[in-house]
Amino acid sequence: MGTFVISKRFDDFYKFVFTSRKGKTIFTSPSMELKMECEHHIEAIKANVEKYTYVKARAASGKYFFKMMLNDTVIATSRKYTTALLLEKGINEIIRTAVKSDVLDFTLNEFMFPD
């Protein structure tokens, strides 16, 4: 089962990632000003995962990735995959497990290596 992880970036914005059961990041959200925006997006994904579209693309390096979209808005961008088959497996993991995935909140953790 996958997991949503909310964390705080160094610039004080928030993001969330969806990780596979093995702990590998499948996608990362754009930066968000408020933590509740992350929570809202996660709940929307869990409630309506079938309504999202996955726009597949190829990076200049030749690796595959996708953008998770809803109504022409990018909700998240995937990690890079070496093959189209692995990309499909990543998308299927979201569709299969997002609904029952846990949400972990790491926003209160201090940075290990502050400036």
Regions found by a protein language model. Give the residues of each.
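Terminal recognition/anchoring or ligand-binding modules at protein termini
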Residues: 83-115
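A short, exposed loop/beta-hairpin motif centered on an aromatic-Gly-Thr core
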Residues: 23-34, 73-83
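Short, solvent-exposed interaction modules
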Residues: 44-96
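Short, surface-exposed, charged/polar-biased interaction segments
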Residues: 27, 37, 59, 63-66, ...
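A low-complexity, Ser/Thr/Gly/Pro-enriched, surface-exposed linker/loop concept
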Residues: 25, 32-54, 93-104
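Short aromatic-glycine-(Arg/Gly/Cys) micro-motifs in beta-strand/loop hairpins
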Residues: 3-26, 57-75
